[in-house]
Curated annotation (Swiss-Prot):
This is Beta-hordothionin. Thionins are small plant proteins which are toxic to animal cells. They seem to exert their toxic effect at the level of the cell membrane. Their precise function is not known. The gene is THI1.2. GO terms for cellular component: extracellular region. InterPro entries: Thionin, Thionin-like_sf. It comes from Hordeum vulgare (Barley). Belongs to the plant thionin (TC 1.C.44) family. 4 C-C subfamily. The lineage of its organism: Eukaryota, Viridiplantae, Streptophyta, Embryophyta, Tracheophyta.
Length: 136
């Protein structure tokens, strides 16, 4: 793996670490609808939890279950939104793997980057983040 590829992997790991920290915080907010969930997620990029929950009509909770009137729990695989993992994979691949493809020197290196990056995204979105998937 060339030095450009190693730098790309390191950038990917750093960003995934930052996103993972952010995801753990969002697991404690419940929204009435997918629109409310999307509003909350967008707001949380820069806004505080309480401010975003109020603005998007969501509710903060300390448990893993949402009240029946607030069924949309963020990024929990057994919530009412099983597609969150698919959206996570798609977003991760679009943002991280595209960068790595552009850093590849040749087709063989590009295939290797895409394979490792896709595996890392799947592991990240399923909650199994580990360095072994990138260094294998």
């Amino acid at each position: 793996m060339g030095s450009k590829g190693l730098k790309g992997v390191m950038v990917c790991l750093l960003i995934l670490g930052l996103v993972l920290e952010h995801v753990q915080v969002e697991g404690k907010s419940c929204c009435r609808s997918t629109l409310g969930r999307n509003c909350y997620n967008l707001c949380r990029v820069r806004g505080a939890q309480k401010l975003c929950a109020n603005a998007c009509r969501c509710k903060l909770t300390s448990g893993l279950k949402c009240p029946s009137s607030f069924p949309k729990l963020a990024l929990v695989s057994n919530s009412d939104e099983p597609d969150t993992i698919d959206y996570c994979n798609l977003g991760c691949r679009a943002s991280m793997c595209d960068y790595m493809v552009n850093a590849a020197a040749d087709d063989e290196e590009m295939k290797l980057y895409v394979e490792h990056c896709s595996d890392a995204c799947v592991n990240f979105c399923n909650g199994d983040v580990g360095l072994t998937s990138l260094t294998a």
